């Protein structure tokens, strides 16, 4: 029972990471060319990258 559960957890982790990476890319594409939000781009990417690392 342990091995399938672990595989399921790993699969979920990969799915969540892919989802967060997609959000990160979307934020990058949306805000990168907006002069108002440009200063916050670095903070957004750092925030989402730290989220990905925490999971």
Swiss-Prot record:
This is Uncharacterized protein 065R. It comes from Invertebrate iridescent virus 6. It is found in: Membrane. The chain crosses the membrane at residues 27-47. Keywords: Membrane, Transmembrane, Transmembrane helix. It is a single-pass membrane protein. Its main location: membrane. GO terms for cellular component: membrane.
């Amino acid at each position: 029972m342990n091995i399938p559960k672990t595989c399921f957890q790993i699969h979920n982790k990969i799915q969540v990471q892919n989802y967060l990476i997609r959000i990160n890319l979307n934020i990058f594409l949306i805000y990168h060319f907006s002069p108002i939000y440009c200063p916050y781009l670095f903070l957004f990417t750092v925030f989402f990258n730290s989220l990905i690392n925490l999971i």
